[in-house]
Design a protein with these regions (language model features):
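Single conserved hydrophobic/aromatic residue that forms the stacking wall/gate
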Residues: 1-9
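Well-ordered alpha-helical segments within folded domains of soluble proteins
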Residues: 27-36, 98-107, 152-161, 200-206
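Catalytic cores of carbohydrate-active enzymes
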Residues: 35, 41-153, 194
């Protein structure tokens, strides 16, 4: 098809192909999901083709600006791009918010950006670079922390990316801030559009202390639990338990992790661990600490 031949969706004029950039990034993730399914079905040739297509996100990365940018029908990056702007090239978001939409290959995105240090700097900027006070934001940009828009779902996984660069305490800090300040027990308690339940789903996962950055990977990046004890009674008859006995609004930082009583050194849990009825214990404190082994392997 045309998209595959061009390796991305292009704009023949400013608004000819609405959301061309965000479509390119999201289709690359869709292709990855197809590849995973094909691999499970033993369709190796199909899997290889769609794994290749899932790398098309690299075709809209501009190393001159370090952002994803739309291309015109000649293949050139469209002039006048600013990551702050909300344009027809990106669905209800700006260049800051869609830059991270490579859930299938975060390690590859880190390399593309220039390595862990540069990626960490860009993450910091995402949460500290505030819109101008006189800037009138669109109605979907709510729950803002810097350029992070919790009220609009494309940003939801970004908080958990600090795990990938050895700074999990920042994931814990921002996850706690969002849970405690942007969700209220009121009739208008959500800071944005629920959109098929995603605002609530983010909260439920994050309150348990983890979140599926790449939902088809079978991994859940560890954040910070909200409650001292959570139990999931599973359909297979087993019970998955999360314990954090000393967690409170100050003790948001994980000091150590045990799974089934054994020390655990990763910044993610697996679907298999959950379904096995594991018990995860978090030792919490008010002091940030590095935990886990990071950047050790590609996403599955």
């Amino acid at each position: 098809d045309r998209r595959q031949r061009q390796m991305c969706i292009r704009d023949s004029s400013y608004n000819a192909e609405n959301w061309s950039l965000s479509k390119t990034l999201e289709y690359a993730y869709d292709d990855y999901c197809i590849a995973r399914l094909a691999e499970k079905l033993g369709e190796r040739q199909v899997a290889d083709e769609f794994y290749k297509r899932s790398q098309n996100y690299k075709n809209v990365y501009n190393p001159q600006t370090s952002f994803m940018q739309p291309r015109d029908d000649k293949g050139a990056f469209i002039d006048g791009f600013s990551p702050d702007d909300y344009t027809p090239h990106i669905c209800e978001s700006n260049g800051w918010q869609y830059f991270w939409s490579v859930q299938q290959d975060i390690d590859g995105l880190i390399v593309l950006t220039g390595g862990k240090e540069r990626f960490a700097q860009k993450l910091d900027s995402m949460f500290t670079y505030r819109p101008a006070d006189d800037e009138e934001l669109p109605i979907f940009s709510t729950g803002m922390i810097g350029q992070y828009a919790h009220g609009n779902e494309p940003s939801h996984h970004v908080i958990y990316l600090f795990n990938k660069v050895g700074q999990p305490w920042k994931t814990q800090k921002y996850a706690s801030e969002v849970m405690r300040e942007l969700y209220k027990n009121t009739p208008a308690g959500l800071c944005g559009n629920e959109d098929c339940g995603q605002m609530s789903a983010w909260y439920v996962f994050s309150a348990m202390g983890f979140y599926p950055v790449n939902p088809v990977s079978g991994r859940y990046e560890i954040g910070t639990p909200l409650f001292p004890e959570i139990k999931l009674h599973l359909a297979n008859g087993k019970t998955f338990t999360v314990l954090a006995p000393n967690v409170n609004k100050e003790n948001i930082y994980i000091q150590s992790i045990k799974v089934d009583g054994q020390p655990y050194d990763k910044t993610y849990l697996t679907h298999e661990q959950i379904m096995s009825g594991a018990t995860v214990e978090f030792e919490m404190s008010n002091t940030p600490k590095a935990i886990g082994v990071i950047f050790e392997e590609k996403n599955p």
